[in-house]
């Protein structure tokens, strides 16, 4: 029960934050609907494809769906902006100095900008997730 309330609170927070972002941008329509199974995915790097639903990844903010193939390994890296992830299918695997997390369907994780971490896709299922940032999206390999 506590988990359901937590997920509901996260969903409301993300929805309200997104509404504020859209209020600050000129939009021809206030409603955007996208189905993760029917959007057009484009390959980004081997093992990763993405479909931007709103915004611009190069300038930010943006939101969209991302797929990791089974066993995908992004290596240790950081991002300039915070990255918010909600997993839809499979599992987004996450690891940092504090330990590892398996982020599964219905789970949420916020990765602060500048935080060094590793991420990847489940070995059998890969991962399908919705992600958004309030700045540009980047991946800076760790040294």
Go through each PLM region and give its residues:
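Bacterial N-terminal signal peptides that target proteins for export
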Residues: 1-9
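Bacterial N-terminal signal peptides
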Residues: 8-18
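A short, N-terminal "cap"/entry segment at the start of jelly-roll beta-barrel domains
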Residues: 22-62, 143
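Conserved hydrophobic/aromatic beta-strand scaffold that supports enzyme active sites
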Residues: 52, 63-65, 84, 100, ...
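Short acidic-glycine-tyrosine-enriched beta hairpin
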Residues: 58, 97-114
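Conserved short histidine dyad/triad with adjacent acidic residue
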Residues: 59-79, 112-116
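Glycine- and acidic-residue-biased ligand/ion/polar-headgroup-sensing regions
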Residues: 69-72, 79-97
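Ligand-binding loop in jelly-roll beta-barrel domains
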Residues: 113-137
